[in-house]
Amino acid sequence: MRLLREYLHGTEFIEVETPILQPKAGGAIAKPFQTHHNALNLDMYLRIAPELYLKRLVIGGFEKVFEIGKIFRNEGIDQTHQPEFTMLESYQAYADMNIVMDMVEDMCNYVFDNLEIDKKLEFNGEEASFSGPWKRVSMYDLVSEKFGIKINFNSKFEDISSKLTDQNIDFEAKTVGLLVFELFENFIEKEIKDPTFVIDYPVEVSPFAREKKDQQGVTDRFELFAFGSELANGFSELIDPEDQSFRLKEQAIKKSAGDEEAHVEDEDYVEALQYGLPPTGGLGFGIDRFVMMLVGKPSIREVITFTPLKPEN
C-alpha cells in the first residue's frame, strides 16, 4: 500500500476519506451489511464502495482524488472473496477509460520496479507475465471467438440464443447484453491468465459507466483480469443526471423484484450530478488480490489478518 500511495501522490492525486457508514449502500452491485443508527432512528449500511462520495468531491472541485480503505459486502467467502477487504478507488477529472487503463498498468509497474521482483509470476501452479503492454480486448469479441458466433451491439437476441441452444449451451439471460456478460463470466473469465483489460461491458451491468456514442447498449468500461480473477474495474463515468436517474430507477425495479445486489435509487447523488461532474475516469483496484498474486498465495485469507471465522460452538 505504501508504493501505491507513493505512485498516486507522485501523480498529484489527493488522498481523502469518505464515510464508511452510509445512509444508502451505493457505488457497486453488491449486498450490504445493514445496521441502525439509534440517535437518528435511521437504517444505515457499511459501505460497499466509496464511489459516489468520491465523485461528489470531483463535482466540488477536487480533480484527482483517491482513497484506500475497507469495503464490506455481505456475500460469499471463497479463495478470492471476503466480506471485508481493502480497495483502492481513484477518480480523475478530464480523464477517460483509456487514461485510467494506462494509469493502472503504470502503477503496477511502479510496484514491480520498486520491489525489484520478476514480472513473471507463479500463482496456483500457473505462470503469467505482467510485462507490458497488457492486452485490451472487447468482451463481445471474446464471446464471439469462444462460441463461433458473431455478436455485437446490434445483434438480435433470438438469433444468438438459437445458435447457443444448438450448441447445448445453457443460459438465463433475456437480452443480448446480459447474455454476453453471462457467457463471459461462466466460460471465459477463468481462462484469462496474463493481465488483460476486458472492455465494452453491457450497459445492463454498468449503471455508472458512460455509454459508447457509436454502440448502443455498450459502455466505456473495463475490468482487469489475471490468473482468472478480477483485479480492477474502471470506466469513463456517466455524467448525465437524467441518464443516471433512469438507470438507477431500472436498478430499483430489479431490487423490488428480489435482486438483493441491485443498486438503490439515490436522489441525492443525482442531484449532485446536476451541479456538473466533468468528464471523469474512475478506478476500483483490489489490493488484496494483487498482493495474493505478488506473493503467490492461493487464498485471500492468507493476505488478510483476522478474517471472520465461524465460532467452534
Q: Where are these predicted regions, by residue range?
A:
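Histidine-anchored, small-residue-rich loop motif
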Residues: 1
